[in-house]
Amino acid sequence: TDLVQYYGDLLTRLRMSSQSGVEIGMFGTISSGTIKRILIKLDKGQKLTEKEQTIYDTACAEMRKIIPQPQAPGAFPTGMLLGATWNREAVHQCASAVGREMDAYHVDVVLGTPNVNLHRDPLNGRVFEGYSEDPCLTAQLAPEFVKGVQEEGPLANVKHFAANNQETCRHSINVRIGERALRELYFPGFRACVQEGKVRSVMSAYNKINGESCAMNHWLLTDVLRKDWGFDGFVVSDWGAAYDQVKALSAG
């Protein structure tokens, strides 16, 4: 097709390092440089990305021991690719490599490893992060990623708890759902990470469940996570989700 031919032509114009940069997209660092080589000029969004990266680089250079910045990070399979292996050992080995690399960069907590949200919407731009649409397969593989990372030193962090399965309106959407569906579909991956993987950190989601924000949901974070499953680690909210800090702390 014309589209295949178009992108095939683009790839022939890129060096291998540039191809990797486009695929990885680390804060736009390598990607923006690649775009500049194949386009006449950057648009406003691309210029903003480049400016943000400059600020980030400067901050990291000044605070190298506090904010580690990977200079040549490895490129690892996405959750969807790992899920397609149906192979616990392969997932464990991949996670071990991630853990070793993060430890080398003095990273204490590897956020979002793993993402166990199910594949429910093909239009979800982040669906590739999760393992599968199948809660059973997810519950088999995710604990292996947790163990692989934590055996190397850094703490794993499983996200987004819970029922966070679309990007559209993800900061405000209210998921109206019964407890049976939660426990049979959306909880198994998290429960396996807690009870089998011994994950030390959980990230709460932006969305609400039956009217109650996940980041400030006592039933979710205390009754289910801590009392039912025995979790004794710490919960972090997704970025800015705990807008009522007192309620969030009280919720667990």
Sequence positions of predicted segments:
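Glycoside hydrolase catalytic-domain context in secreted enzymes
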Residues: 1-252
